[in-house]
From Swiss-Prot:
Gene Ontology BP annotations: cell differentiation; nervous system development; regulation of growth
Function: This protein is associated with nerve growth. It is a major component of the motile 'growth cones' that form the tips of elongating axons. Plays a role in axonal and dendritic filopodia induction.
GO cellular component labels: filopodium membrane; growth cone membrane; synapse
GO molecular function: calmodulin binding
Annotated protein name in UniProt: Neuromodulin
Post-translational modification: Palmitoylated. Palmitoylation is essential for plasma membrane association.
Swiss-Prot/TrEMBL keywords: Calmodulin-binding, Cell membrane, Cell projection, Developmental protein, Differentiation, Growth regulation, Lipoprotein, Membrane, Neurogenesis, Palmitate, Phosphoprotein, Synapse
Lineage top rank: taxon: Eukaryota
Annotated spans, Disordered: 1-214
Source taxonomy: Eukaryota, Metazoa, Chordata, Craniata, Vertebrata
Length: 214
């Protein structure tokens, strides 16, 4: 019995040793596999995070564009809402005109009885109309004279510079003529002097042979 127990114990010890060896042999591979899986997982997570960030940026840009478009639409709507407000006074204009038209007949009716009571008012109105006609006639009669006087003054003003220009041109012509006359006089005097000198030379030459003959 003891021999059997010893043998069985030895067999169990050997089995435990084999299991330990198997566990030790599998551990490095398992570690390498786990490390590789961790690296792959971290790399995938990094890539996924980048994609998520890019998607968020795109979403933000699209949201910004949409917000800008919405703001532009809101501004256009506000401007459209503002423009009718400016036109509201013009819409009220006809109502005010109607009110004035309604009030004016009442005022005319009030004024008619007062005009019927005094009998001397038509004569005063006739006098006023006659005075106004006379004033208008006088103004119309005086206006042509005023226009004629203004036209004469303007023509005089227009003639004054022309006269000054004519006087200046005449003076220039006189100066030019006087200078030409002076030049002509100088030329005549020079010609006379040259002729007299030639005559003197001729007389002196004629006198020389006479002296020699004498």
């Amino acid at each position: 019995m003891l021999c059997c127990m010893r043998r069985t114990k030895q067999v169990e010890k050997n089995e435990d040793g084999d299991q330990k060896i198997d566990q030790d042999g599998n551990k490095p591979e398992d570690k390498a596999h786990k490390a590789a899986t961790k690296i792959q997982a971290s790399f995938r997570g990094h890539i996924i995070r980048k994609k998520m960030k890019d998607d968020k940026k795109d979403d933000n840009s699209e949201e910004a564009v949409e917000n800008h478009k919405g703001e532009a639409k809101d501004e256009a709507a506000t401007t459209e809402n503002k423009t009718p407000k400016t036109e509201e006074p013009t819409a009220d204009g006809p109502l005010e005109v109607k009110k004035e038209a309604i009030s004016s007949p009442a005022e005319d009716k009030k004024q008619e009885p007062s005009s019927e009571k005094p009998k001397d008012t038509p004569s005063e109105e006739n006098q006023a109309s006659a005075e106004s006609e006379s004033t208008t006639k006088g103004s119309t009669e005086n206006s042509p004279g005023v226009d004629a006087s203004q036209a004469k003054e303007e023509s005089k003003k227009a003639d004054v510079p022309e006269a000054t220009q004519d006087a200046a041109s005449e003076k220039e012509q006189e100066k030019a003529e006087s200078s030409q006359e002076d030049v002509k006089k100088d030329e005549v005097e020079e010609i006379k002097a040259s002729e007299s000198a030639q005559q003197d030379e001729a007389v002196s030459e004629e006198a020389k042979p006479d002296q020699e003959n004498a």
